[in-house]
Amino acid sequence: MQWVEVEVLTTAEAVEAVAVILEDYGATGVVIEDSADLTRKWEDRYGEIYALDPANYPASGVRVRAYLPVVSWQEERAGEIQTRVKALAAVGLDPGAATVRYRLAREEEWAYGWQKYYHPVRVTKGLTIKPTWEEYTPSPGETVIEIDPGMAFGTGTHPTTILSLQALERVLKPGARVVDVGCGTGILALAAAKMGAGAVLALDLDPVAVAVARKNIARNGAADKVTVRNNDLLAGLEGPFDLVVANILAEVILKMIPDAGRVLPAGGTLIASGISRGKAGVVEDALLANGFAVEDTLTSGEWVTFIVRNLLPDPVEC
């Protein structure tokens, strides 16, 4: 079977929206090539993470790559995609160059080409994430999580995921009851379990994500601690939980904040990640308006993660 490889050149803040546009045209996932990764200081207190090949990255901006079935592709689709990407400016997102390129691709490129972008990554002081096909020998005391993203998800090396993992390492207490909202591959739920959580509930609206997360959790021997289920954010959950972590779009976090306050007792913690700098002020205002206090703010490039505490008293039962 032949595929059409579509590339969109955009900005970091518009990546998620561009991915959604490509999914509307039949993509089951995207590869994100951010030129900033080439200049980001990867050698930090965790040591060298991995070497990046400049040939795989654009000279500037962010390239979003997807594979679409050739049987459903028409040449005018490129223009349609470009129009929709440029229209993101109307909702406050910088679309950048918004150029669209496409070419025919072989079956093996679609099936395996994306794997070259994933390598073992030391994401916190004691945690490394590795794809299933890579060999890796951990150092003493190092925890390794093995992830098979398939073609629909990343391996947990996106800056927003790394910020979420670092936030978890800072605030998670042994035995905590944790909810991972929008779990994707299950990486945050797995990390919480490995860091000592007592019980973890991983939620996602996408049944594909639920299936992938369950496989990854079983592969890492965490099924006794982590439960995965299909759910729309925190709708219908009773709680209480000690910690809610959500690495999702700012707009979705805004929708979730009231329910987070409901399922978290006074003193409970929310980690809100996936927020672009341009949206951080709006999210912070909503958090404060709903009774949360900001305890810490983590940043990486264009991305912001809030660690907040619920200050509202627990509801009184009558």
Swiss-Prot record:
<feature type="binding site">
    <location>
        <position position="247"/>
    </location>
    <ligand>
        <name>S-adenosyl-L-methionine</name>
    </ligand>
</feature>
<keyword id="KW-0489">Methyltransferase</keyword>
<keyword id="KW-0949">S-adenosyl-L-methionine</keyword>
<feature type="binding site">
    <location>
        <position position="182"/>
    </location>
    <ligand>
        <name>S-adenosyl-L-methionine</name>
    </ligand>
</feature>
<dbReference type="GO" id="GO:0032259">
    <property type="term" value="P:methylation"/>
</dbReference>
<feature type="binding site">
    <location>
        <position position="161"/>
    </location>
    <ligand>
        <name>S-adenosyl-L-methionine</name>
    </ligand>
</feature>
<comment type="similarity">
    <text>Belongs to the methyltransferase superfamily. PrmA family.</text>
</comment>
<protein>
    <recommendedName>
        <fullName>Ribosomal protein L11 methyltransferase</fullName>
        <ecNumber>2.1.1.-</ecNumber>
    </recommendedName>
</protein>
<dbReference type="GO" id="GO:0016279">
    <property type="term" value="F:protein-lysine N-methyltransferase activity"/>
</dbReference>
<dbReference type="InterPro" id="IPR029063">
    <property type="entry name" value="SAM-dependent_MTases_sf"/>
</dbReference>
<keyword id="KW-0963">Cytoplasm</keyword>
<dbReference type="InterPro" id="IPR050078">
    <property type="entry name" value="Ribosomal_L11_MeTrfase_PrmA"/>
</dbReference>
<dbReference type="InterPro" id="IPR004498">
    <property type="entry name" value="Ribosomal_PrmA_MeTrfase"/>
</dbReference>
<dbReference type="GO" id="GO:0005737">
    <property type="term" value="C:cytoplasm"/>
</dbReference>
<feature type="binding site">
    <location>
        <position position="204"/>
    </location>
    <ligand>
        <name>S-adenosyl-L-methionine</name>
    </ligand>
</feature>
<keyword id="KW-0808">Transferase</keyword>
<comment type="function">
    <text>Methylates ribosomal protein L11.</text>
</comment>
<dbReference type="Pfam" id="PF06325">
    <property type="entry name" value="PrmA"/>
</dbReference>
